[in-house]
């Protein structure tokens, strides 16, 4: 039985992780739940159903309500609860499904405590990949990627020598604006951007999908996860989102992972590995016609890919700067302060003007993050 802490339990990935746990109750014990939003009713339902001994929230009113409603549960406010879960002896696996880098100190504490890290948070590796990789080697941390693309690559590479790999391919749906002309892109609305043709995701990641910044972040994440050179990591448009990642080996053979576009598949793989367990969700249906298309990304139209490659060349502070600046620009777009086209234009200018510095500690990461947010708010 695995003993789990779920960071971000009321978010999309957190809820789906609990759905998998619900379907395989004999395999899991939920020891800790952490929520970053104010979804009171949902979080209370989760506490009642899974009976965690540790809970953590970021809303002070909700914290006091939990203490009153669940007096036997250890309730914590803000980072204190994440750190309590990260260092609890009875927990062996942390499911990091929160967004941003708020959980970074707890993730590092978990690594130092010998926990397995089930990682659904790409910002952690984008912002602190060098730091995380160093700790993973030092403490022999097992990092299991939940992102569908990286999970697919992980499955293809499992037990194989990366020296035999020619190239990794992440697939991209192309997002909601894939077939719009350059002229049409100047007039897109928030409603246009949030209508993703395949995935049902939060607003921020859906905007990132439309600019392909999400794919840029994933290229950076793949670099830190798999230890290949950035020239050996690529992305291709695959509108059907049935193939999630491909590995081309030196002999020209390509291995891939195929499943319907649902996070339930990579989440279940990570939670149950090394076993393959019966799934409550449906797999591929080959009784109907399936079409698979692949074509290259227009990097002139989507400079986010080139920006990600520049981050990997520069390293240091460029990762946390890129991540934080983009996050603020997306927020400004969603508030109707800037146009969609401004996101990549302003991000390109910010990255061009950024002076790369060393970034080897938590303080460094948070300092660069703060600087990038301020500059992205002003530009």
From Swiss-Prot:
<feature type="binding site">
    <location>
        <position position="148"/>
    </location>
    <ligand>
        <name>1-deoxy-D-xylulose 5-phosphate</name>
    </ligand>
</feature>
<feature type="binding site">
    <location>
        <position position="218"/>
    </location>
    <ligand>
        <name>1-deoxy-D-xylulose 5-phosphate</name>
    </ligand>
</feature>
<dbReference type="Pfam" id="PF08436">
    <property type="entry name" value="DXP_redisom_C"/>
</dbReference>
<dbReference type="Pfam" id="PF13288">
    <property type="entry name" value="DXPR_C"/>
</dbReference>
<dbReference type="GO" id="GO:0030145">
    <property type="term" value="F:manganese ion binding"/>
</dbReference>
<keyword id="KW-0479">Metal-binding</keyword>
<feature type="binding site">
    <location>
        <position position="214"/>
    </location>
    <ligand>
        <name>1-deoxy-D-xylulose 5-phosphate</name>
    </ligand>
</feature>
<feature type="binding site">
    <location>
        <position position="123"/>
    </location>
    <ligand>
        <name>NADPH</name>
    </ligand>
</feature>
<dbReference type="InterPro" id="IPR013644">
    <property type="entry name" value="DXP_reductoisomerase_C"/>
</dbReference>
<feature type="binding site">
    <location>
        <position position="209"/>
    </location>
    <ligand>
        <name>1-deoxy-D-xylulose 5-phosphate</name>
    </ligand>
</feature>
<feature type="binding site">
    <location>
        <position position="11"/>
    </location>
    <ligand>
        <name>NADPH</name>
    </ligand>
</feature>
<feature type="binding site">
    <location>
        <position position="173"/>
    </location>
    <ligand>
        <name>1-deoxy-D-xylulose 5-phosphate</name>
    </ligand>
</feature>
<comment type="pathway">
    <text>Isoprenoid biosynthesis; isopentenyl diphosphate biosynthesis via DXP pathway; isopentenyl diphosphate from 1-deoxy-D-xylulose 5-phosphate: step 1/6.</text>
</comment>
<feature type="binding site">
    <location>
        <position position="147"/>
    </location>
    <ligand>
        <name>Mn(2+)</name>
    </ligand>
</feature>
<feature type="binding site">
    <location>
        <position position="10"/>
    </location>
    <ligand>
        <name>NADPH</name>
    </ligand>
</feature>
<keyword id="KW-0414">Isoprene biosynthesis</keyword>
<dbReference type="Pfam" id="PF02670">
    <property type="entry name" value="DXP_reductoisom"/>
</dbReference>
<feature type="binding site">
    <location>
        <position position="215"/>
    </location>
    <ligand>
        <name>1-deoxy-D-xylulose 5-phosphate</name>
    </ligand>
</feature>
<feature type="binding site">
    <location>
        <position position="12"/>
    </location>
    <ligand>
        <name>NADPH</name>
    </ligand>
</feature>
<dbReference type="InterPro" id="IPR036291">
    <property type="entry name" value="NAD(P)-bd_dom_sf"/>
</dbReference>
<dbReference type="GO" id="GO:0051484">
    <property type="term" value="P:isopentenyl diphosphate biosynthetic process, methylerythritol 4-phosphate pathway involved in terpenoid biosynthetic process"/>
</dbReference>
<dbReference type="GO" id="GO:0070402">
    <property type="term" value="F:NADPH binding"/>
</dbReference>
<comment type="similarity">
    <text>Belongs to the DXR family.</text>
</comment>
<protein>
    <recommendedName>
        <fullName>1-deoxy-D-xylulose 5-phosphate reductoisomerase</fullName>
        <ecNumber>1.1.1.267</ecNumber>
    </recommendedName>
</protein>
<dbReference type="GO" id="GO:0030604">
    <property type="term" value="F:1-deoxy-D-xylulose-5-phosphate reductoisomerase activity"/>
</dbReference>
<feature type="binding site">
    <location>
        <position position="121"/>
    </location>
    <ligand>
        <name>NADPH</name>
    </ligand>
</feature>
<dbReference type="InterPro" id="IPR026877">
    <property type="entry name" value="DXPR_C"/>
</dbReference>
<feature type="binding site">
    <location>
        <position position="149"/>
    </location>
    <ligand>
        <name>1-deoxy-D-xylulose 5-phosphate</name>
    </ligand>
</feature>
<dbReference type="InterPro" id="IPR013512">
    <property type="entry name" value="DXP_reductoisomerase_N"/>
</dbReference>
<keyword id="KW-0560">Oxidoreductase</keyword>
<keyword id="KW-0464">Manganese</keyword>
<feature type="binding site">
    <location>
        <position position="202"/>
    </location>
    <ligand>
        <name>NADPH</name>
    </ligand>
</feature>
<dbReference type="InterPro" id="IPR036169">
    <property type="entry name" value="DXPR_C_sf"/>
</dbReference>
<keyword id="KW-0521">NADP</keyword>
<feature type="binding site">
    <location>
        <position position="149"/>
    </location>
    <ligand>
        <name>Mn(2+)</name>
    </ligand>
</feature>
<comment type="function">
    <text>Catalyzes the NADPH-dependent rearrangement and reduction of 1-deoxy-D-xylulose-5-phosphate (DXP) to 2-C-methyl-D-erythritol 4-phosphate (MEP).</text>
</comment>
<dbReference type="InterPro" id="IPR003821">
    <property type="entry name" value="DXP_reductoisomerase"/>
</dbReference>
<feature type="binding site">
    <location>
        <position position="13"/>
    </location>
    <ligand>
        <name>NADPH</name>
    </ligand>
</feature>
<feature type="binding site">
    <location>
        <position position="196"/>
    </location>
    <ligand>
        <name>1-deoxy-D-xylulose 5-phosphate</name>
    </ligand>
</feature>
<feature type="binding site">
    <location>
        <position position="122"/>
    </location>
    <ligand>
        <name>1-deoxy-D-xylulose 5-phosphate</name>
    </ligand>
</feature>
<feature type="binding site">
    <location>
        <position position="218"/>
    </location>
    <ligand>
        <name>Mn(2+)</name>
    </ligand>
</feature>
């Amino acid at each position: 039985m695995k003993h789990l802490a779920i960071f971000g339990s009321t978010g999309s990935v957190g809820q789906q992780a609990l759905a998998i746990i619900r379907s395989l109750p004999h395999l899991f014990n939920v020891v800790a739940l952490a929520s970053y939003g104010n979804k009171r009713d949902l979080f209370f339902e989760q506490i009642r159903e899974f009976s965690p001994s540790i809970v953590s929230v970021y809303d002070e009113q909700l914290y006091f309500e939990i203490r009153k409603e669940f007096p036997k549960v250890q309730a914590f406010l803000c980072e204190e609860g994440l750190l309590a879960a990260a260092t609890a002896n009875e927990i062996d696996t942390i499911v990091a499904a929160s967004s941003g880098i708020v959980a970074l100190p707890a993730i590092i504490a978990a690594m130092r405590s010998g926990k397995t890290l089930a990682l659904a948070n790409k910002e952690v590796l984008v912002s602190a990949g060098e730091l995380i990789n160093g700790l993973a080697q030092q403490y022999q941390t097992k990092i299991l990627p939940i992102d569908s693309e990286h999970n697919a690559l992980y499955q293809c590479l499992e037990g194989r020598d990366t020296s035999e790999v020619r190239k990794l391919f992440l697939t991209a749906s192309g997002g909601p604006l894939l077939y719009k002309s350059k002229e049409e892109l100047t007039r897109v609305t928030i409603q246009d951007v949030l209508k993703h043709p395949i995935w049902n995701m939060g607003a921020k990641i859906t905007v990132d999908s439309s600019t392909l910044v999400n794919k840029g972040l994933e290229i950076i994440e793949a670099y830190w996860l798999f230890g290949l050179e950035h020239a050996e990591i690529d992305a291709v448009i695959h509108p059907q989102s049935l193939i999630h990642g491909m590995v081309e080996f030196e002999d020209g053979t390509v291995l891939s992972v195929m499943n319907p576009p649902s996070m339930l598949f990579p989440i279940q793989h990570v939670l149950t590995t090394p076993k393959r367990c019966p799934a409550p969700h449906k797999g591929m249906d080959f009784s109907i016609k399936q079409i698979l298309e692949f074509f290259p990304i227009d990097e002139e139209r989507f400079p986010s890919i080139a920006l990600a490659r520049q981050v990997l060349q520069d390293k240091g502070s460029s990762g946390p700067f890129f991540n934080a600046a983009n996050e603020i620009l997306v927020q400004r777009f969603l508030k109707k302060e800037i146009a969609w086209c401004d996101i990549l234009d302003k991000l390109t200018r910010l990255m061009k003007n950024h002076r790369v510095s060393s970034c080897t500690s938590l303080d460094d990461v948070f300092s660069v993050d703060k600087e990038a947010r301020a500059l992205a708010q002003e530009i």
